[in-house]
Design a protein with these regions (language model features):
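Short, Asp-centered acidic motifs that coordinate Mg2+ and/or phosphate
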Residues: 1, 46, 126
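Beta-strand-loop-alpha-helix segment that lines the small-molecule cofactor/substrate pocket
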Residues: 46, 52-53, 57-105, 119
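Conserved hydrophobic residues forming the short capping helix/wall of the S-adenosyl-L-methionine
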Residues: 14-18, 87-90, 116
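Predominantly a Rossmann-like dinucleotide-binding segment in NAD(P)-dependent oxidoreductases
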Residues: 96, 103-166
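A structured beta-alpha segment of the ubiquitous adenosine-cofactor-binding alpha/beta core
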Residues: 25-46
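N-terminal Rossmann-like dinucleotide-binding module
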Residues: 1-20
Length: 166
């Protein structure tokens, strides 16, 4: 099943599936709560969440309460309370909840891991990494400038797991 606030994005995804020879997927779109209809389906095992960050925790919690496993883009949560709410829901519902972290498998991260495993840094007692990149060309892509606003209102590295994941 496919879900997005914007029907045109669902249509694009549907076209990709069709071109690849997959059957047509059920679609949900056009309202703020369309994703809940997807989660309510009995034939869905896993929900993959790739929305603005403010929606991650509520969507993960709802999906797990509906018996779904969850895979969510980073950051999965933006507050400590959200983290505990997600953890407690996963434990209570016995559903898997995974934060997707594709950047930890990039060349630089795996090279650093390999060097550490070879002992090139000696005994590693502590390490810190960060993931910082210029998002200026993408600001218009993020509806309502949610990503720019988040970065303006919060300090620190919102992708703390990117730099040293493995």
């Amino acid at each position: 099943a496919l879900c997005d606030l914007h029907p045109d994005r669902v249509e694009k995804s549907q076209a990709i599936l069709k071109k690849a020879g997959f059957p047509e997927a059920a679609t949900y779109s056009g309202s703020e709560d369309a994703w809940k209809q997807l989660c309510d389906r009995a034939d869905i095992d896993l929900v993959y969440i790739a929305t603005d960050w403010a929606r991650h925790a509520p969507m993960m919690i709802y999906a797990m309460q509906k018996g779904k496993h969850v895979a969510c883009e980073v950051p999965a949560v933006t507050t400590l309370k959200e983290a505990w709410d997600v953890i407690n829901t996963a434990e209570r519902t016995q559903r898997h909840c995974m934060m997707l972290e594709n950047c930890v498998y990039d060349f630089f991260e795996l090279t650093t891991l390999n060097m550490a495993q070879q002992g090139l840094f000696g005994d590693v007692l502590s390490a810190k990494g960060a993931y910082i990149h210029n998002l200026e060309p993408f600001w218009k892509y993020y509806e309502g400038d949610w990503r720019l606003k988040f970065n303006q209102e919060h300090r620190g590295d919102v992708y703390a797991t990117h730099g040293l994941g493995p």
